[in-house]
């Protein structure tokens, strides 16, 4: 039997405590399994993904990730947090939400540095990634100075590590 990566049990979530997004959701994801979350606008797809990534937490119900209950306390644990962040990522629908540092370069290196990758290795990876995606000319620019196309090109940057 394969390892259970994620399990949502009877999950409820409401934005600002009053706008329901999820109501009694149950979901299991096994190691190696590929899933698709589909539905109309406003049906909670992005909310489920944000919960799976530990960006928000259910109002009611539980989420387990890699055999542990996922909550703010466990994500405060440096060892688990590094393990979790090395396995789970999130690509925002709107690249303006994703790019939050003063320069593109700082935005790209933020994740690996938070995961404990050394400054030297991070900069080496940055050079390879920038050359591969032909974004060397964007590195010193502020995210708000980028075109929509340039921002979309950078939306995959959390996964270059």
Segments (PLM) and residue ranges:
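The feature captures the beta-strand-to-loop junction immediately N-terminal to the Walker
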Residues: 38-40
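Short helical segment in ABC ATPase nucleotide-binding domains corresponding to the A-loop/adjacent helical element
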Residues: 96, 102-113, 123
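Conserved ABC transporter NBD signature motif
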Residues: 61-73, 84
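Conserved ABC ATPase "signature" region
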Residues: 120-138
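Helix-to-loop junction immediately C-terminal to a conserved catalytic motif
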Residues: 53
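Conserved ABC ATPase signature
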Residues: 142-150
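A short, flexible loop at the N-terminus of ABC-type nucleotide-binding domains that lies
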Residues: 2-8, 12-24, 119
